[in-house]
Amino acid sequence: MAAKEVKFGDSGRKKMLAGVNVLADAVKATLGPKGRNVIIEKSFGAPLITKDGVSVAKEIELKDRFENMGAQLVKDVASRANDDAGDGTTTATVLAQAIVNEGLKAVAAGMNPMDLKRGIDKATIAIVAELKKLSKPCTDTKAIAQVGTISANSDHSIGDIIAEAMEKVTKDGVITVEEGSGLENELSVVEGMQFDRGYLSPYFINKPDTMVAELDSPLLLLVDKKISNIREMLPVLEAVAKAGRPLLIVAEDVEGEALATLVVNNMRGIVKVAAVKAPGFGDRRKAMLQDIAVLTGGTVISEEIGLSLETTTLEHLGNAKRVILNKENTTIIDGAGVKTDIDSRISQIRQQIGDTSSDYDKEKLQERLAKLSGGVAVIKVGAGSEVEMKEKKARVEDALHATRAAVEEGVVPGGGVALVRSLQAIEGLKGDNADQDVGIALLRRAVEAPLRQIVANSGDEPSVVVDKVKQGSGNYGYNAASGEYGDMIEMGILDPAKVTRSALQAASSIASLMITTEAMIADVPEDKPAGGGMPDMGGMGGMGGMM
């Protein structure tokens, strides 16, 4: 086991504080509408230019092991805020730095660290409760666009495109962000339910110019097994041919003789048909087949529930207005499912999302929810260069997380004002002793830090602005982009309540633990020889008399 170096008390805390300040100073430069850029060297390719706090934090590793521990703990603050709300990483870092700096001063002055922590925890609970009272629901498109704009560093085009996407696919819809090919941002919305399985044979194509198979007013046969024998399908195929409607078969697989017969029937015009594999695998495939059944008003033909292909009738088949299949995807538009059944399926999936602890399962359930309830929107980010593309894409993703958080828990006045207004919750708050009171007072000063930093980054005097904002009330605050004072909500400067709350909770949780640190342990760096050439090879020895 490698030897360890141990630092106690003040000597360890000073090193930790130095690391906290290095990371926080790099991250906080990006805060606010006039936040600066940070350039990050990459091992290959062009450097990355970003204003995204968590991207900056992730890149920082310090040489001194004790300083690095401080930096990594603040990095954890940013990651926690990011995981919880998807944004607010820079605010969380600024708050953590302020709490640690104020807290360690109090510890050096002889305060009890554990009582300081208890005071900070009490004040945090009171401020979080006050933030909930201050928050207002965010439902209209204008408010959503404003939240997106603020999160994307005052880029109106990003806020507007996110609001448009949310309007089209509802708050439960899936919105994905991709790199576009042009200079402008583009939004494309997929109507209906789309899943990532294409036609099983190119012979099903009936629109050669676009290479798609399009079925108008089709019936849907949903089967939870492989189909290889055409005989078991004959009764249902004959019934469909008599009805004179096209048929889409969604099964685990259609192969061999069955697929060949379907292709021949389709080409001869006996029955217009297309076949596709069911999406997903295992239990997820069963669930997705059931989703399609609910959406189209059909029944999944499964031996588990005593149904077989031979006994299938037209009543078991689903209905849709249109189905479009290409090489990779199938889209079902306007399924004829009963609305109450669809709503009950949606609430069942919502319940599963709440119950699962796996991020992967949650993501897949969210996708299923979106396909049933809203749809899928894709924002294609446009930019003039690859460097700009990466920076812009990160901002769009941040803004998307922020708008989702705003819809979830409402909005509060932005620009650091909500935290300053929430101070009224701890005006009369008292701890159990004098040291806890210091912890409460310490947080009172720390929550002003985001506003101070926004003002400093915009080139104004923080103390003057903070004082003027404190004299005001309600939504009154400072617009750093224009240098004006006024009603933050009227000026469109909104923050999601969830982002502000998560930032404060993550910062006070980790920062208060850092204040209570008494010993730090790190590996002793190994003394490696400086460079060193090759070992001496010795002489060549006598070569003898060569003639």
Swiss-Prot record:
Disulfide connectivity for this sequence is none
GO-annotated cellular components: cytoplasm
InterPro entries, alphabetically? Chaperonin_Cpn60_CS, Cpn60/GroEL, Cpn60/GroEL/TCP-1, GroEL-like_apical_dom_sf, GROEL-like_equatorial_sf, TCP-1-like_intermed_sf
Main location (coarse class): cytoplasm
**Can you cite a GO biological process for this protein?**
protein refolding
Q: Which GO terms describe its molecular function?
A: ATP binding; ATP-dependent protein folding chaperone; isomerase activity; unfolded protein binding
Chemical reaction(s) catalysed? ATP + H2O + a folded polypeptide = ADP + phosphate + an unfolded polypeptide
Cross-referenced Pfam families: Cpn60_TCP1
What are the binding positions for ATP in this chain? Answer: 30-33, 51, 87-91, 415, 479-481, 495
List locations, semicolon-separated. Cytoplasm
Top-level EC class as recorded in UniProt: isomerase
**Nucleotide-binding listed as a keyword:** yes
Q: Which UniProt keywords apply?
A: ATP-binding, Chaperone, Cytoplasm, Isomerase, Nucleotide-binding
Query: What's the EC number here?
Result: 5.6.1.7
Q: Which PROSITE patterns match?
A: CHAPERONINS_CPN60
Its job: Together with its co-chaperonin GroES, plays an essential role in assisting protein folding. The GroEL-GroES system forms a nano-cage that allows encapsulation of the non-native substrate proteins and provides a physical environment optimized to promote and accelerate protein folding.
- How is the subunit organization of this protein annotated in UniProt? Forms a cylinder of 14 subunits composed of two heptameric rings stacked back-to-back. Interacts with the co-chaperonin GroES.
**Family statement drawn from the similarity comment of this UniProt entry:** Belongs to the chaperonin (HSP60) family.
Q: State the protein's name.
A: Chaperonin GroEL
**Organism phylogeny:** Bacteria, Pseudomonadati, Pseudomonadota, Gammaproteobacteria, Pseudomonadales
